[in-house]
Amino acid sequence: MEDHMTLNATLDYEIDLTATTRVAEEILPKLQKPIDEYLEAVSILRSSRFLCYDCKIKKIPQGGGFHNWHFENGVIGATPRTFVIQVYLNDDFEGGETEFLYQNRREQAVQGDVLIFPAGFTHTHRGNPPIGGTKYLATTWAIIQPDDDN
């Protein structure tokens, strides 16, 4: 039995480096203010230093997305994520909400909005499918940086 599988497939899009550069140069620097506001509201985190890593830009076609309920720090052996930062890159579609199970809340995508939430099971969520268009989303995760003394 093989322990992996190689798929030969043609993707329906190409990586656009100009878009990646735009995210790096225009969007990511603007996250500091929303992150500061989040840390001010969640006082237990104020004294910690954070590192945001692994920014992913997702193209979610009509009907697509990750519809299963999940949370962001549940993988054994993975870097423990403290909170999630999502930036909605467009809003020219219906549906496509980020839905939170225990909060009984749906966040509709509004272009330019930043959604920050805890990575733990308390904020189990899913991405509902976009209807009538494609959703673009940038996601990054924050981890607590250890003290220099450790």
List where the protein language model places each region.
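Fe(II)/2-oxoglutarate oxygenase catalytic core
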Residues: 1-114, 122-150
